[in-house]
């Protein structure tokens, strides 16, 4: 059961980390929902904006200005949150790999491996927090912006909805939460694995046997009175 939970958490962690990284690097956080011309598909990401022609499939991308330039608060905060989530998720996944029983790292220290799994689970739980905040905040902002335009009967020629990159960010964050929950539960389910449990009575028996044998081989010195009493009894 322990191995099954570890492998399930590892499976979730690797896909969640991949989803977060792909979501951060791709450009489809916003996609056009209603295009009056219907000749192109526009996608906006955290780093650039791309337009794909619907007829010939030609794709052109324009990068945003330098990171030091002024950008909307939504873009800057989402960048920071997603990069933080990527780093934490990657660190948690590497720590989890070292804690797996099938990995030959500290094979004689199972209690340390359990602690590594606990640390990995904690880091993954923390990694899911900025990821879900950044993804949901971006999606809500896009929805509110679109709803406000519709409410005021304003049509700018194109309206956006959140795209698959935003969905990947949410999925990766939820996967980190689930993997972290599995790993932290593993520590309590298998908390009996420790240094005391690794050395059972059978391994401690030689020490007690040696102590008994040494006690048997040890003979207290006889006093002069005892020696005289022994001689008298022989006579």
From Swiss-Prot:
Impact reported for residue 233 to A: Loss of interaction with TJP1. Retains localization at the lateral plasma membrane but does not anchor at the tight junction
- Similarity section: Belongs to the claudin family.
Protein purpose: Forms paracellular channels: coassembles with CLDN19 into tight junction strands with cation-selective channels through the strands, conveying epithelial permeability in a process known as paracellular tight junction permeability. Involved in the maintenance of ion gradients along the nephron. In the thick ascending limb (TAL) of Henle's loop, facilitates sodium paracellular permeability from the interstitial compartment to the lumen, contributing to the lumen-positive transepithelial potential that drives paracellular magnesium and calcium reabsorption.
**Which parts of the sequence form the motif Interaction with TJP1?**
233-235
Query: What name is this protein filed under?
Result: Claudin-16
Q: Subunit structure, per the record?
A: Can form heteropolymeric tight junction strands with other claudins. Interacts with CLDN19. Interacts (via PDZ-binding motif TRV) with TJP1 (via PDZ domain). Cannot form tight junction strands on its own.
Give one GO molecular function term. Answer: PDZ domain binding
Gene responsible for this protein: Cldn16
Q: Which domain of life is it from?
A: Eukaryota
GO terms in the biological process aspect are: bicellular tight junction assembly; calcium-independent cell-cell adhesion via plasma membrane cell-adhesion molecules; cell adhesion; monoatomic ion transport; paracellular transport; positive regulation of calcium ion transport; renal absorption; transepithelial transport
